[in-house]
Amino acid sequence: ILGAILPLVSGLLSSKL
């Protein structure tokens, strides 16, 4: 599960940046 959440968080951070 964490493995699927990490990429999601990275995507959100990239979108904000």
Swiss-Prot record:
Q: In which tissues is it expressed?
A: Expressed by the skin glands.
Q: Which residues does the record list as Leucine amide (modified residue)?
A: 17
- State where the protein is found: Secreted; Target cell membrane
Sorted alphabetically, the Gene Ontology cellular component annotations on this record are: extracellular region; membrane; other organism cell membrane
Q: Which domain of life is it from?
A: Eukaryota
Give the GO terms filed under biological process for this record. Answer: defense response to bacterium; innate immune response
Q: Which keywords annotate this record? A: Amidation, Amphibian defense peptide, Antibiotic, Antimicrobial, Immunity, Innate immunity, Membrane, Secreted, Target cell membrane, Target membrane
Job of this protein: Shows more potent growth inhibitory activity against the Gram-positive bacteria S.aureus (MIC=50 uM) than against the Gram-negative bacteria E.coli (MIC=150 uM). Has a weak hemolytic activity against human erythrocytes (LC(50)=135 uM).
Which protein family is named in the record? Belongs to the frog skin active peptide (FSAP) family. Alyteserin-2 subfamily.
Q: What is this protein called?
A: Alyteserin-2c
